[in-house]
Amino acid sequence: MALHDENVVWHSHPVTVAAREQLHGHRGVMLWFTGLSGSGKSTVAGALEEALHQRGVSTYLLDGDNVRHGLCRDLGFSDADRQENIRRVGEVASLMADAGLIVLTAFISPHRAERQLVKERVGHDRFIEIYVNTPLAICEQRDPKGLYKKARAGELRNFTGIDAIYEAPDSPQVHLNGEQLVTNLVSQLLDLLRRRDIIRS
């Protein structure tokens, strides 16, 4: 079947996004965490999800490693595979946001163009780009998975920040200092969600 087969049409459903959001008691949005490996994306996203859950907010966290165990298990780390990885995640996260959830995504997502495509897919008003800015030297010191060590030794090729480029966001909605305490970063994000009337508490 062709990618845009004329026989495939969009089917609207009687339950709207607004109705789902009303049921949840908050807006459905996508929080896109981006940054180098070891920057703290997953840690901050996980801590924020826990804080939201404690406040009765419906959430789901999509993590870069986890999706490669299932949804993206057939993909490698070439530029083409990385692009497809982000496209798939963007589609899934968009559906979850439509369901009225606050979706947190923690992906290196090194290219601006890919992040822009996700933003366009979910809608500018429901996409919040969160740049976890941590110096490469600090990320290498942390190196929780030992990947930087392997990359420096030549055992791991095409690793972002070493021999593959990371394009930092030009104007992210949120710019976090990844060297700050996680609790401080979570507080900043909760304040943002309240100011934007995404959550109430």
Curated annotation (Swiss-Prot):
This is Adenylyl-sulfate kinase. GO terms for molecular function: adenylylsulfate kinase activity; ATP binding. ATP binds at residues 35-42. Belongs to the APS kinase family. Pathway: Sulfur metabolism; hydrogen sulfide biosynthesis; sulfite from sulfate: step 2/3. The lineage of its organism: Bacteria, Pseudomonadati, Pseudomonadota, Gammaproteobacteria, Enterobacterales. InterPro entries: APS_kinase (IPR002891), P-loop_NTPase (IPR027417). It holds the Pfam family APS_kinase. Disulfide bonds: none annotated. It comes from the Bacteria. GO terms for biological process: hydrogen sulfide biosynthetic process; sulfate assimilation. CDD domains: APSK. Its EC number is 2.7.1.25.
